Amino acid sequence: MKKMPLFSKSHKNPAEIVKILKDNLAILEKQDKKTDKASEEVSKSLQAMKEILCGTNEKEPPTEAVAQLAQELYSSGLLVTLIADLQLIDFEGKKDVTQIFNNILRRQIGTRSPTVEYISAHPHILFMLLKGYEAPQIALRCGIMLRECIRHEPLAKIILFSNQFRDFFKYVELSTFDIASDAFATFKDLLTRHKVLVADFLEQNYDTIFEDYEKLLQSENYVTKRQSLKLLGELILDRHNFAIMTKYISKPENLKLMMNLLRDKSPNIQFEAFHVFKVFVASPHKTQPIVEILLKNQPKLIEFLSSFQKERTDDEQFADEKNYLIKQIRDLKKTAP
């Protein structure tokens, strides 16, 4: 029986698809008058590529073709070009690029992840995606691809330990709500997904990171302020971050900031601040400056906490924690000189 060819005459093989896509992206880059035809060819090629990678309702993706396409994407540099030219591609095409990128990133051969290896060797791909937050028309697409990259520890490590990581502090404050929220989702993912890696990163870069982080906690933007406070609570209560928590709660300026945030005009900010404040009070190993601040404000704190968010009548845990803190503060004694 005659073996069916992998690609029929009407279906181009991966090398042809990649070549057509590269050639037409080059036309789009020039921004001359012939872009309509090129744009159409780009759309068709992306569709064909997606069909090879994802299959269709009728058939599974052909393994051999997927391997060929992946190899072509790496060797031709097209994976990089697709990110670089994302702004030139139409709306549906941008969605296709995201799907193709994430699909090829998940691809494994045994225990190997070839695309993770490729991006590790070409880390500028990660920084192009990160810089995408500065371009509103591609920001959310870049965010989706970036979070897919972060699932892989080697790629998360490259971003965390790069100078560009600090750009997140700027992106989460962007004036466009959707983009700022997306940037925060990526930022949070980076700081919570790979626990041991993150603990190591925070310990090595404590001063720099927390200096930037403090600005988020004092942001004029309510959403940024609330999300940052909530994430801070998660970070210092994670057992992997014990050393970071110990350092954070030893510093009097951090306690003062939380005491101010307990009095914020927003009840939600107050509530998130409470969850960080309680760590200072509940710690059995308070530093002397922390004890002194709590003693200096002892009567005021007891009175304040007694009536703090009394409307939360259905939250038993909150009531228990509040009573525990009141007792801890009441029992504080001046140490003999």
Swiss-Prot record:
Molecular-function annotations in GO: protein serine/threonine kinase activator activity
GO CC annotation terms, alphabetical: cytoplasm; cytosol; serine/threonine protein kinase complex
Domain of life: Eukaryota
Coiled coil region boundaries: none
Biological processes annotated in GO: intracellular signal transduction
Function summary: Component of a complex that binds and activates STK11/LKB1. In the complex, required to stabilize the interaction between CAB39/MO25 (CAB39/MO25alpha or CAB39L/MO25beta) and STK11/LKB1.
Annotated family: Belongs to the Mo25 family.
Misc note: Found in serum of 50% of patients with acute monocytic leukemia.
Subunit structure, interactors included: Component of a trimeric complex composed of STK11/LKB1, STRAD (STRADA or STRADB) and CAB39/MO25 (CAB39/MO25alpha or CAB39L/MO25beta): the complex tethers STK11/LKB1 in the cytoplasm and stimulates its catalytic activity.
Protein name stated in the entry: Calcium-binding protein 39-like
The encoding gene: CAB39L
